Swiss-Prot record:
Name of this chain's protein: Putative ankyrin repeat protein RF_1087
Heme found in the keyword field: no
Gene source species: Rickettsia felis (strain ATCC VR-1525 / URRWXCal2)
Keyword Ubl conjugation: no
Lineage: Bacteria, Pseudomonadati, Pseudomonadota, Alphaproteobacteria, Rickettsiales
InterPro entries the record matches: Ankyrin_rpt, Ankyrin_rpt-contain_sf
């Protein structure tokens, strides 16, 4: 991957074959590649066709170290996808408690829907 990026950094950093490289690396759990892409200027807020950002993917995977890396790189913590879901909501729906705790530590906004989810979690 590093060779591909060095060859044509401007267009490859964010896309390859219409796929978002950060999204692919996050889904595969390659934290080192995520860090490398961010260092090379990849956009931490890049969205796919459903409006899902890098944090949405990391939240679904429960990858806490990647979530923290993305937030520190400027990822918008309260971004909405086209279904109006935030990364925090996806972490809750996926049962990724460590990710939920991290989002709350970074002061992710808790909306009405999320309040209902959190009340259910607290009762269990």
């Amino acid at each position: 991957m590093k060779r591909i990026i060095k060859k044509d950094q401007s267009s490859v950093i964010n896309y390859i074959n219409d796929q978002k490289l950060l999204h692919l690396a996050i889904r595969a759990g390659y934290k080192n590649i995520v860090e490398y892409l961010l260092k090379k200027g990849a956009n931490p807020n890049i969205q796919n066709n459903n409006g899902e950002t890098t944090l949405h993917f990391a939240a679904m995977n429960g990858c806490v170290r990647t979530i923290e890396c993305l937030i520190k790189s400027g990822a918008i913590i309260d971004s909405f996808d086209k279904f109006e879901r935030t990364p925090l909501e996806l972490a809750i729906n996926s049962g990724n408690t460590d990710a939920v705790k991290l989002f709350l530590q970074y002061e992710a906004t808790i909306g009405n829907t999320l309040n209902q989810y959190l009340n259910i979690l607290v009762k269990n």
